[in-house]
Structure formats: C-alpha cells, structure tokens
From Swiss-Prot:
Its EC number is 3.1.26.5. One of its GO terms (cellular component) is ribonuclease P complex. This is Ribonuclease P protein component. PANTHER family: RIBONUCLEASE P PROTEIN COMPONENT. It comes from Desulforamulus reducens (strain ATCC BAA-1160 / DSM 100696 / MI-1). Consists of a catalytic RNA component (M1 or rnpB) and a protein subunit. Keywords: Endonuclease, Hydrolase, Nuclease, RNA-binding, tRNA processing. Belongs to the RnpA family.
C-alpha cells in the first residue's frame, strides 16, 4: 500500500492555487497540479466560516480518509488541494464521497478539453 502524504508548506499550497487546474461544486473545490517526481500529495483547506474546530476537523478527517481509501484513483506525481465550502458543514461521509467524485469528474472533463 502506498503512503498517504499531506501538503504542509504554504508555498506548496500557493503553487497549486496559482498554477493548478480547479473544479468546484456547492460543497468542495478541488485543485490539481502536477509536481515533478514528488509523489501524490494532498492538502485540505477549511475556513473558520465552515464551523467550529470540531466540525472542521471532522470534515478534514472524512476527506483524508476518502483520499486514503481511494488512493489508487488519484494520479501519481500530482498535488491535490481540497477546499471545503461552508455548505459542507452538515454533510456525512457518504455525502462527502459523492461530492468528491462529482468534483473529480468535472476536473477530469475540464482537463480533457
């Protein structure tokens, strides 16, 4: 099983935001940016507007687990950043999974065009 690696540095997040491709729906925004041989890395950004710390951490844990569970579906040597929108605060695991794949499909369509 491959290792789950998180983005930590602010400069890495800025590169993904500036040069990456994005897709969004009501609940999530997903950025994808190819990195040069650094492997598959994930970052999560959840604003304080989403809710209190308990809510934000629950959403981060849900997304992290979804990414870990479906690790083989994500491209190698790419950075992914998920931005959780305020409307996601009451979503459960299965709903977030559905929203994640919806955004993933939009991103793949956008890349093909």
């Amino acid at each position: 099983m491959k290792k789950f690696v998180s983005l930590k540095k602010n400069s890495d997040f800025r590169n993904v935001y500036r040069f990456g491709v994005s897709a969004a729906n009501r609940y999530l925004v997903l950025y994808k940016f190819p990195n040069k041989g650094l492997g598959r890395r994930f970052g999560f950004s959840i604003s304080k507007k989403v809710g209190k710390a308990v809510c934000r951490n629950r959403l981060r844990r849900i997304l992290k687990e979804l990414c870990r569970f479906h690790l083989d579906r994500f491209s190698d040597d790419c950075d992914f950043v998920f931005i959780v929108r305020q409307t996601s605060s009451d979503q459960d695991f299965h709903q977030m999974e559905k929203h994640m794949w919806h955004v993933w499909g939009k991103l793949n369509k956008q890349e093909k065009n």
